[in-house]
Amino acid sequence: MSDWKSMSKDELELQYSPSRWSPRMSADDVIRAHVSALKSGTERARSVTQTLMDVPYGEAEGEKLDVYLPSSSSPDVPLVIYFHGGYWQFLSKDESGFLAVPLVQKGAVVVAVGYSIAPKGDMDLMVSQVRRSVVSVIQQYSHISGLYLCGHSAGAHLAAMVLSTDWTQYDVSPKIKGAFLVSGIYDLQPILSTYVNEPLKMTEEVALRNSPSRFLSQLKVSSASCDITVAVAQNDSPEFRKQSEEYYKALESAGLKVSFEDVSETDHFSIIEQLVDENYLLTKLLLKMIGKS
């Protein structure tokens, strides 16, 4: 496949427009259906689990978490932090509890993280926020059996940036046991000239310092024992698939514990929507990762 640098702006825009690659429905319809699926899944999770809503992890208005709790607490409770997608400019924690039910039913705590999406927040701020959210969670839940991250699309990018954090600056060491990176972007340079960057206003310098693909040595120091799954949809665009494949290969070459899942019969949206289903491949893999299969 040709290098993104040789693509026209139109081709890059197409490659980085996930909704235009779904075989299920039109671009507008797939986004509408996605939002609807996330909202209804989150409403269900809120109705069947115990919740703590809008827990602050910082001073800013957008710095809040939603926590989904199992009905009985046992000593070995894994905690899964979810970072939502939406190209850093859409969606929020308020539709991000949909994956909680199968996890909470097995005794896990699920935390959905809010962050200041563009144009309110910029990329540096969002990366700082998700890092601080993890610090706050470990301080609040020191008794957990393990901390795990899950992120979709832009959220997978943010999760990968968390894995690449120099924690000495935060006086903590989270010891993240596992990370589930679903249909993410790990090199931000290709989107600089696309519509995606219009509200983000990233310069090349900002894109480079927030590209996980450039921080493998830090990830190796911070997250050496982390079990990482890189997942991609069969009907993700070739560029999205390439982002996941190349990041997976780089992690593997760096000697990290990483596996690759190419999920058949999914697109960029259904690959994450189906986490509501305990029998879905990725749900089973996530439950296995957190020791609750």
UniProtKB/Swiss-Prot annotation:
Primary location group: cytoplasm
Coiled coil: none
Cytoplasm in keyword set: yes
Keyword Hydrolase appears in the UniProt entry: yes
Transmembrane segments: none
Biochemical pathway: Amino-acid degradation; L-tryptophan degradation via kynurenine pathway; L-kynurenine from L-tryptophan: step 2/2
Residue positions of motif HGGXW: 84-88
Enzyme Commission code: 3.5.1.9
GO biological process: 'de novo' NAD biosynthetic process from L-tryptophan; L-tryptophan catabolic process to kynurenine
Intrachain S-S bonds: none
Reaction catalysis annotation: N-formyl-L-kynurenine + H2O = L-kynurenine + formate + H(+)
Active site (UniProt): 153 (nucleophile), 236, 268
Keywords for this protein: Cytoplasm, Hydrolase, Nucleus, Tryptophan catabolism
SUPFAM superfamilies from the UniProt entry: alpha/beta-Hydrolases
Molecular function, one GO term: arylformamidase activity
UniProt family annotation: Belongs to the kynurenine formamidase family.
Assembly and binders: Homodimer.
Its biological purpose: Catalyzes the hydrolysis of N-formyl-L-kynurenine to L-kynurenine, the second step in the kynurenine pathway of tryptophan degradation. Kynurenine may be further oxidized to nicotinic acid, NAD(H) and NADP(H). Required for elimination of toxic metabolites.
Name of the protein in question: Kynurenine formamidase
